[in-house]
Structure formats: C-alpha cells, structure tokens
Amino acid sequence: MKHTLYSIILLFFIKIVSTYAQEDPLTTPRKDRLNDFTQLKVYSGILVNLIPSDENKAIIYGDRYGSIRVRQKGNTLKLRMRFGELFYYHNTYVDLYFKSPLHVVKLHQGASVQTEAPLSQSKFLLKAHEGAQFEGTLETEYLVTKVRTGAQVSLRGETSEHILKVSTGGVCEARNLKSERTQVCVFAGGEVGIFSDTQVEAHVSMGGTIGIQGKPKSVIARRTIAGEIYSQNQNTNRSYSKRNSRRNFNRFN
C-alpha cells in the first residue's frame, strides 16, 4: 500500500515538474508570424537580434515574454512591453527574422538591437535615444545615424555617405565603419569616433568630442563654445585647427 502511495506521489511530482518545464519561456519561446515590414521601433529595454531570412517572424523568450506587445501598422513593426511591465524588462529577448530590407530602426527606453548578419541596402536611418543600444554591420550607400540622451551605437561595415548627429551624452563608435564622405555634428557631451580616408565635415560644440581615424584628404572642422576634434591614428596627437565651414549644418536638425 505504501509502495503504491509513494508511486502515485512520485508520478504526480514528475507531472508537475514536466508541466513547469514545458511552460518555461526560456525553453518554450513564443512564436509570432509577421507581415512584411521595413521600419522597426523597439521600446522598454527589449533585446532584439536581427536575422535576415526568407520569412517574417518573431521568436520571443525570457522573463515576462508574454508581456511583449507586437504591433504592425503599415510597414512599421513596434515591439514594447505592456505598460504595467515597464520595470521588468531586463531579460526579455526577441529573435526577429525579416525578408524585406530594413530602412528605418528607432530605439527607445533602453532597448538593445544587434545584427546577426550585415544589413545590405541602399539607405538606412538609425535613431537611438534614452539609453538604447545598437551594434551591427552595415553595407549601405547612404546612412543617417542620430544618437542622443545616453544611447550608444557601434557600427561596422561600409557606406558611401554617413550623416551623423550625436548629442546629450550619446556615443557613436564608428571607427570600423569605412565611409567615403562623413558629415558629423556633435554637441552637449556627445562622443564620436569615425574612420575616413576621403572627406570629413565635423562640427562640435558645448563639450562634444570627435575622433577621426584614417587619413582623410579633406577635413573641414568647426568648433563652437567648446569641444574637440582630433586624430585617433596611432602615435598621432593632432588636434584639427578651427576652420569655419561654409556648408550649412542645418540638415542635421
């Protein structure tokens, strides 16, 4: 009788453990099918891995994975936590598979995005705000990057033209991104590192810092109030002299 009772208890315990294991979001992720999208917006500290594919889908796992809201409107995909779960997002992950080229990526509220493979396309706009992070390899002809309010961006790859604006404590590490022409505007404590062997137009103000790696044939440097523009080449401590540029930097606004 006791043996039978112990067997029943053991089977009941195994069933409970098995049920919890099946419901564990780390082992049984949520899968969402998606329509085509060309713009991505990520919020709430969600960690996203971009994966080029022949299908559109989101594999969601980690803590409170059921609280992620996936919304599509037109060509825009939004990923965010439910309002009541905004403070519990530290271990929530999304593997995002996509078919069409991504033209726009906007990151807010500590969200983080990285690329599984190079993003190859003609144009790309990246915005990172509010402590968000982006790390990836790009192969583009025209790239616009805007980083502010403590966000951090790390770029690799190649582009023909790079327009870069960094402000309010934002950081952009782009020394591994080869660019033929770079226009960069940094202010209010922003920090930038870029690479160029051709042409650089740099404007810094109010404590911003721009480090230039490579040997650009043309450097137009402009400083306002405070800031620094200097060479980051090995054994070189050159600081670019102040030269007023006739170019209009309003296009960065």
Each model region followed by its residue ranges:
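Intrinsically disordered, low-complexity terminal regions
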Residues: 1-253
